[in-house]
């Protein structure tokens, strides 16, 4: 029977499946951070259990840490408690931890691939909803809750029901100036934020194949934003080239054997998908969200929709509520909308490719006077090191931006990087929910180049009309 890539990955990891019961999957890699792991370790201690496979678990600090200081003693409140707990728990169990004293520390979904911890064919879990990022390597990766974190620590397995299979094909080549972020926002705009519910999505087509691994990670990162359980891209030479020589990637004959296996990880030609979505790459414009979920998105050359013209009552009510919160009128041209802050970072867009794209826009230009703050936050210490080696930090600083240390930063209001009330932000992150970046903050999701352009022009502009340096 022909199988999709998802079905192959799932079936290869079933440990036990009784008739009428949820299958139990083996988990190859478990990534943890300071926010969703403390209660799980507490649960292990209460039950008198050990971490079953320490060598398959890796930790980092990212969500609640400061991007301004690297000293845990200078953290405050809950953030300090969480970081100290993670450090204590990893030391007590022998789990490898990339803490703030190491250059390998970073956002969990940046650090994992960088270290070669993310490999094709794996099952990967983390107590974080954007674990789908790792699916860019042809791994079955998804977020789990804290009770499931405890279960994986104790058993290295997880009960998991089978999902439906969805294929999203992006045909042809994108036009100049169009990025992975624009592709995935356009996909979400077409499917809506619930279009992938109950599915694992495989992204394919020429436009996806043309993406770097950084770009593929951006696309898979946001699979959750249209309701999917996980996102996948079948591994190919781009994948292998990225992974070769990474610290935890196979070496020597093991590498050759691994690549031979990885080349089998693709959907069979006659595999049947439950849902198929097709986009033409040439039709994708630079994307900007106008509302309070990633599916409320338009091309920069379009006007904000008018709820009065929407026929579905639920969609109409959602749009009316979103526009009231975001402070926009129907039929507004977003190119006339000024921004207060700009955030370039997050597990969606904080890799070296993203920073290069932003720097190309900001080089030789200055932050607009109406923009209060521009935060540029690399996704890991290694990304920061590479950016500084290339002089990107100097470009950002000369433009009036702040160059920070690695962390989740302003993606979420969980640390000291936040929007002020009713401030409007051009953000490269993945969620524009109400209050996501701070109480009553207004978030517009864009690509790194679009965010950088908003920083120097003080408003949203069409990046296709901006000269790059």
From Swiss-Prot:
Pathway linked to the protein: Amino-acid biosynthesis; L-leucine biosynthesis; L-leucine from 3-methyl-2-oxobutanoate: step 2/4
Annotated EC: 4.2.1.33
Molecular function (Gene Ontology), one example: metal ion binding
BP-aspect Gene Ontology terms: L-leucine biosynthetic process
Coiled coil: none
InterPro entries associated with the record: 3-IsopropMal_deHydase_lsu (IPR004430), Acnase/IPM_dHydase_lsu_aba_1/3 (IPR015931), Acoase/IPM_deHydtase_lsu_aba (IPR001030), Aconitase_4Fe-4S_BS (IPR018136), Aconitase_4Fe-4S_dom (IPR036008), IPM_dehydratase_rel_enz (IPR050067), IPMI_cat (IPR033941)
Requisite cofactors: [4Fe-4S] cluster
CDD domains: IPMI
Cofactor note: Binds 1 [4Fe-4S] cluster per subunit.
Keywords of this entry: 4Fe-4S, Amino-acid biosynthesis, Branched-chain amino acid biosynthesis, Iron, Iron-sulfur, Leucine biosynthesis, Lyase, Metal-binding
UniProt keyword annotation of Transmembrane present: no
Domain of life of the organism encoding this protein: Bacteria
Subunit note: Heterodimer of LeuC and LeuD.
Function: Catalyzes the isomerization between 2-isopropylmalate and 3-isopropylmalate, via the formation of 2-isopropylmaleate.
Similarity comment: family membership: Belongs to the aconitase/IPM isomerase family. LeuC type 1 subfamily.
Protein name: 3-isopropylmalate dehydratase large subunit 2
Species, as recorded: Mannheimia succiniciproducens (strain KCTC 0769BP / MBEL55E)
Gene it is expressed from: leuC2
């Amino acid at each position: 029977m022909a199988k999709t890539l998802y079905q192959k990955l799932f079936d290869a990891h079933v440990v036990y499946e009784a008739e009428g019961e949820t299958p139990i999957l083996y988990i190859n890699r478990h990534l943890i951070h300071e926010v969703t792991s403390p209660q799980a370790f507490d649960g292990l201690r209460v039950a008198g259990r050990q971490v079953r496979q320490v060598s398959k678990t890796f930790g980092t600090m990212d969500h609640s840490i400061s991007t301004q200081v690297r000293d845990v003693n200078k953290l405050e409140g809950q953030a300090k408690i969480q970081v100290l707990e993670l450090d204590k728990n990893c030391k007590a169990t022998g789990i490898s931890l990339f803490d703030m004293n190491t250059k390998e520390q970073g956002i969990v979904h940046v650090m994992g691939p960088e270290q070669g911890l993310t490999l094709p064919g794996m099952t990967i879990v983390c107590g974080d909803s954007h674990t789908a990022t790792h699916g860019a390597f042809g791994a079955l990766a998804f977020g789990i809750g804290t009770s499931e974190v405890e279960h994986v620590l104790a058993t290295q397995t997880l009960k998991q029901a089978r999902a439906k299979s969805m294929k999203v094909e992006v045909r042809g080549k994108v036009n100049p100036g169009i990025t992975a972020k624009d592709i995935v926002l356009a996909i979400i705009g077409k499917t809506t934020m619930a279009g992938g519910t109950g599915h694992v999505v495989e992204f394919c087509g020429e436009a996806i194949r043309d993406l770097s691994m950084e770009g593929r990670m951006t696309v898979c990162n946001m699979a959750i934003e249209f309701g999917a359980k996980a996102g996948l891209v079948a591994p190919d030479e781009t994948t292998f080239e990225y992974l070769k020589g990474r610290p935890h990637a196979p070496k020597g004959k093991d590498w050759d054997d691994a690549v031979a296996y990885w080349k089998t990880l693709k959907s069979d030609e006659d595999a049947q998908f439950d849902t198929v979505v097709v986009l033409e790459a040439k039709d994708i414009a630079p994307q900007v969200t106008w509302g309070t979920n990633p599916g409320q998105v338009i091309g920069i050359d379009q006007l904000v929709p008018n709820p009065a013209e929407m026929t579905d009552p639920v969609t109409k009510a959602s749009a009316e509520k979103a526009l009231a919160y975001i402070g926009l009128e129907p039929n507004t041209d977003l190119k006339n909308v000024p921004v207060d802050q700009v955030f370039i970072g997050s597990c969606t867009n904080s890799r070296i490719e993203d920073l290069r794209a932003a720097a190309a826009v900001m080089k030789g230009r200055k932050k607009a006077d109406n923009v209060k703050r521009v935060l540029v936050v690399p996704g890991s210490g290694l990304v920061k090191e590479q950016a500084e080696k290339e002089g990107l930090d100097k470009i950002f600083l000369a433009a009036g931006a702040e160059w920070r240390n690695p962390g989740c930063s302003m993606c979420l209001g969980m640390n000291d990087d936040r929007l002020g009330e009713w401030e409007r932000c051009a953000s490269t992150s993945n969620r524009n929910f109400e209050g996501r970046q701070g109480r009553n903050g207004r978030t517009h999701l864009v690509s790194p180049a679009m965010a950088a352009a908003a920083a120097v022009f003080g408003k949203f502009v069409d990046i296709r009309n901006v000269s790059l340096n």
